[in-house]
Amino acid sequence: MPSQSRSRDRYGRDSDRDRSRVQPRRRYHVSEDDDDDDDFDDNPRDRRYRRDGYRRAPVDSRAYDSHDDYEVVDVEEEPRRYRSDTERRRERARASPGTSPRKRERTRDSGGGHRRRRTEESDGSQAPQAHRDRRSRTRRDRGLDDEDLEDAARRLRRRERERERERRAETSKHKSTDSSNSSAGLLNANALAKLRAQHEELDRQEQRRAEKEAKAERKRRRKRPAVEGQMRTLDPFPDEVPRGQSKGRIVSGAYLEEGRAPDMEVRLRGGGRGPPRERRWEKDSDGSAPLTPFWKRKKWWWIGAIVLVIVVIIIVVAVVVSNNKKSDSDSDSDSNSGSSDSWGGDKSSLNGLDHDSIPKSAQGTVLDPWTWYETTDFNVTYTDETVGGLSVMGLNSTWDDSVAPNENVPPLNKPFPYGSQPIRGVNIGGLLSLEPFITPSLFEGYSSDVVDEYTLTTKLGDNAARKLEEHYATFITEQDFADMAEAGIDHVRIPFSYWAVNPREDEPYVAKISWRYLLRVIEYCRKYGLRVNLDPHGMPGSQNGMNHSGRQGSIRWLNGDDGDTYAQRSLEFHEKISKFFAQDRYKNIITIYGLINEPYMLSLDVEKVLNWTVTAAELVQKNGITAKIAFHDGFLNLSKWKTMLKNGPSNLLLDTHQYTIYNVAQIVLNHTAKVNFVCNDWVGMIGEINSTSEGWGPTICGEFTQADTDCAKNLNNVGRGTRWEGTYSEGDSTMYCPTAEQRTCSCTEANADPSEYSDDYKLFLKTYAEAQMYAFEQAQGWFYWTWHTESAPQWSYKTGWKNGFMPAKAYNPDYKCGDDIPSFGNLPEYY
């Protein structure tokens, strides 16, 4: 445990502090007979005081000093003795076994340094004076007065005397022949080894402390003014600042930046004696915290500025979006606007109505007329009434079935004479069930992956509903139905798909909007006396894997692991629509009720398809459907149907679709041969299948075309080539046309604008269409595919009718099979 004298020295309270400040320089020598080692303290914590208050001189020994008697030598009066005694002490310290080799080397070097310094002093060098000047500046810089310095010097001298006495005591013990001393040396060997280790650890700690204090001292010096004497001021800023240099930045020393120069002229940019920087530097002035470099502070300023800009942008965007939503809401609620925004057609029927008449729960849904593309010919009075789970919103409460399309057909409220009078009808394909070749514009501008309604609506995402509703409202209008009646048409086949009624939430199709347009189309047919054939064109899972089923690719309806699930969903679809169309308002107009379009029975299990057909027919009849039930031949040879479903439900119609362009044996026939083929082959085939005794029974042709090439864009799927020009299959350039051997087959003329068609070409097209009409009228009649297209004129009944290559009246053709085939003049065979 430290003695009280050491404690007083540690805290600077020794009585020597009161002595006179003018004293001769003295050194204290320990008596030679002092060998007291009771002062040894092996506890490092008790010795820690030796380095808390000051740094040890490099020549100090780590041995402990004694507090026994010592003699005083006046170094000014006896300098020679002082020097000789000092040298002898250093020699004894080097020879002491308690001194480490590294310590001996340092002592030797240090002693040499002292000798060199004394030599320089004796030679009258200026080094001592310079040394004193440096010490004076250091004392002044640290704020130490003379009294503190003298006090520190006394403590330093006392420590040196005590250490020297301990070294002499250790040396005396090891040199003595006295047994007690020898045994004490042996007994204390472990203590000496431990002492050496402690000395080395203290050396390392002192070195680290010295480095730390030196670093702190350098930092303090950087913060002190570099200019002494005459005060300096900053130069004024130039009128023109060099390019790239900041006008507001001041580069100066720490003294000027602190603003303590009385004559300093400085612009305020954080400089001067401003509180923020002053507090920062006052904290740093004691070495307790490093000064953050300017570039790091600048970096944080930049980060803060960027974060602020981002926050501002987010706020602005949020405000704009909020305002847009509010604007849309305000527009929707404007009862006198007649429309929700600039999108859409005629909404004049909303004029004078209050949007609040629509319940909040229905606003923004398919039941809200303010969200519709147009309100033309819709009843906009809100109702949540449903039939079969399907909404009647948009329907008028009254109807008129007294209209006939022409004088040859009875009005709607009179039975149509099926079997004795042929059906002359058209399809409105591509309206409610999209097909890429009918409306290629809807599929343009995308990658080849957009090939059907499924992929198109997936691509359109949230925009799909608006895009498709605009198509529903504009592709075929009321005028089209008026034209149909004018052209002698009496039936309309309406393709639509299951997503008009019950799509799944995970399917991308536009749900239920097409249902409202289906109801409007039926009302247009009613208005012009046109009877309706309902055609479910796309069914859950796809019944044929073709693009017009909604999803091109795999057949999952009645096929695969989920085949039965999809079949059940299709029955649920019929459960709903059969109940709805069993209402009295539809009994006169919907005279043919289709079950499913073109199930691909060449791949499907025929027995499963037949069983499903029976189940579906019985279901819809049970729900009140009295119309004829149409089912498709599944692409099977018609002769196979002579024995299938003969004993099925009553009132069934077999639906067959006949095209020559998909049969490579028929597409290669020349113009005249094609007319002959229809009259010679199809007339007999259709007549036979329509007979209950020789064929199946009542048969209709639900689809056919006058086109004798497959040249229409996207007809064979999006982006695929044609058989006609030999581009249908990759790696196979075989052409299928009458001039294939000459390789002159061309699609250019067939795809040209109808105004460019020659009279001979128009005559052929008209004759070819009328021959097919005649063949199908040998059964129950026909439905042309289709009424309207964007750019495939030979597939558009309307285009042919308006351009002279369809009969002016469907019921009054110019050609019948059995008539002489007219001459087509010089019509080339390559188109």
UniProtKB/Swiss-Prot annotation:
Biological process annotations from GO: cell wall organization; glucan catabolic process
Biased composition (Acidic residues): 32-41
Pfam families per the UniProt record, alphabetical: Cellulase
Subcellular location: Cell membrane
Stretches the record annotates as Disordered: 1-246, 261-288, 325-360
Gene3D superfamilies assigned to the protein according to its UniProt record, in alphabetical order: Glycosidases (3.20.20.80)
Glycosylation (residues): N379, N396, N547, N611, N637, N670, N690
Residues exposed to the Extracellular side: 322-831
Membrane-crossing residue ranges in chain numbering: 301-321
Recorded catalytic activity of this chain's protein: Successive hydrolysis of beta-D-glucose units from the non-reducing ends of (1->3)-beta-D-glucans, releasing alpha-glucose
Ranges per topology, Cytoplasmic: 1-300
Keywords: Carbohydrate metabolism, Cell membrane, Cell wall biogenesis/degradation, Glycoprotein, Glycosidase, Hydrolase, Membrane, Polysaccharide degradation, Signal-anchor, Transmembrane, Transmembrane helix
Biased composition (Low complexity): 178-195, 334-350
GO CC terms of this entry: plasma membrane
EC number(s) from the headed UniProt entry: 3.2.1.58
Active site annotation, chain numbering: E598 (proton donor), E703 (nucleophile)
Principal subcellular localization: membrane
Biased composition (Basic and acidic residues): 1-21, 42-70, 78-94, 151-177, 197-216, 275-286
GO MF, any single term: glucan exo-1,3-beta-glucosidase activity
Stated family: Belongs to the glycosyl hydrolase 5 (cellulase A) family.
Described function: Glucosidase involved in the degradation of cellulosic biomass. Active on lichenan.
Name assigned to this protein: Glucan 1,3-beta-glucosidase D
Organism: Emericella nidulans (strain FGSC A4 / ATCC 38163 / CBS 112.46 / NRRL 194 / M139)
Primary gene name: exgD
